[in-house]
Regions:
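Active-/binding-site microenvironments in catalytic and ligand-binding cores
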Residues: 1-183
Length: 183
């Protein structure tokens, strides 16, 4: 249901569209409304998620809409995000607790920011080899919800980067790749 319209930005009472955040780009897709389809070109927000759509549309607050995400794009982001967790976890283990302090996830490439470390070519080759080895093993990837306290009880604080997350976020998604957990 449409709850707010400002220019070409539409807020809904609920959405499956992922907004820009956590180093990951937003979902694209369409909204199907009573007067046709609208292309969703950008999604932003925290408390209120705003879907940017084509400039010309006929919608009013209270209209019922359904959304369809571009699943190919979403799935590419999911795979890149999982790969980021794998690389970050292995780097942490190989290089004395190096922290991932940022990342940027796209459909076809990603960037991971580590601190404190200056990688040598030899270190990068070792990291690449370990990551490729884990991928070749076809390890199972699972996720689970845990609270901050539960995570802090099983993982060292420097591993979780809990200090980089807003304090109001209490429930977190924990990714397990094989036996290795990351968040």
């Amino acid at each position: 249901t449409v709850t707010k319209i400002e220019g070409n930005k539409i807020a809904l009472d609920q959405t499956l569209f992922y907004p820009l955040g956590g180093g990951q780009n937003w979902d694209l897709g369409i909204l199907n409304g009573p007067n046709g389809q609208l292309n969703v070109t950008e999604v932003r927000g925290r408390d209120t998620i705003e879907h940017t759509v084509d400039d010309v549309f006929e919608l009013e607050v209270g209209d019922e809409v359904t959304g369809e995400i571009d699943f190919e794009r979403r799935y590419a982001h999911m795979k890149m995000h999982t790969a980021q967790h794998l690389v970050s976890g292995i780097a942490y283990e190989l290089f004395d607790g190096v922290r991932t302090v940022g990342n940027q996830i796209h459909t076809d490439r990603s960037r991971i920011d580590f601190h404190p470390i200056q990688f040598t070519e030899e270190m990068l080759l070792e990291l690449q080899s370990e990551v490729n080895d884990k991928i070749q093993q076809g390890l199972e990837v699972t996720d689970s919800q845990m609270t901050r306290d539960e995570i802090n009880a099983i993982m060292p604080q420097e591993r979780t980067n809990m200090d980089l997350l807003p304090a109001f976020i209490n429930d977190l998604l924990v990714i397990t790749i094989g036996e290795q957990q990351d968040m």
